Design a protein with these regions (language model features):
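Nucleotide-sugar donor-binding catalytic core of glycosyltransferases
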Residues: 1-88, 145
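A general structural signal for well-ordered secondary-structure junctions
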Residues: 18-19, 47, 91-92, 113-114, ...
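An acidic- and aromatic-residue-enriched active-site/binding cleft used to recognize and process polar
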Residues: 53, 79, 96-97, 130-131
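C-terminal amphipathic helix plus adjacent low-complexity
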Residues: 102-155
Length: 155
């Protein structure tokens, strides 16, 4: 079975040929793990948060934390509706392949903009989606405790 993300990434690279991509785990490039993974992602400028299958409202793998936590610009399909939590100054939302390509090209040429989006996204993510806040929410929901905390996703 062919993973639709492979086709998407191959097409993205074709139409965005002036930008360097580091893509692992496809096209005979071995995946990277552990320390090598974290060292590699720390040296990237942007991260594509691309999930398997169709985009689902509010769904993301933990990849989003790795991207944003390293201060990278997070590129995410607008169908995830993460715009409900983040502005375009904190995350980059794309409509389709060509829109994503255009946004990657723009950000790759504007270092100041890239750093600003990465930093703002990281600050907001760490404030509202950090592990303590998420764990507290799970505990309160599980035990039926009335929350005194503000959860961005409960608005």
């Amino acid at each position: 079975k062919i993973d639709d993300r492979v086709t998407f990434l191959n097409n993205l690279q074709k139409i965005t040929s002036d930008v360097k991509f580091d893509i692992y785990g496809i096209n005979k490039v071995q995946p990277i793990w552990a320390d090598h993974y974290f060292k590699t992602i720390a040296n990237c400028k942007m991260g594509l948060n691309l999930s398997r299958g169709k985009a689902i409202k509010y769904y993301s793998s933990d990849r989003i934390t790795q991207i944003i936590g390293n201060g990278l610009v997070c590129l995410i399909d607008e169908k995830t509706k993460y715009q409900d939590f983040f502005s375009s100054e904190e995350m980059v939302f794309y409509k389709n392949l060509s829109d994503l390509s255009e946004k990657i090209q723009k950000i790759s040429r504007d270092e100041k903009l890239r750093k600003k989006i990465g930093q703002k996204g990281k600050l907001k993510y760490m404030k509202y989606f950090n592990s303590n806040k998420v764990a507290q929410f799970i505990i309160e929901k599980t035990l039926g405790i009335k929350s005194k905390s503000f959860y961005l996703w409960s608005k």
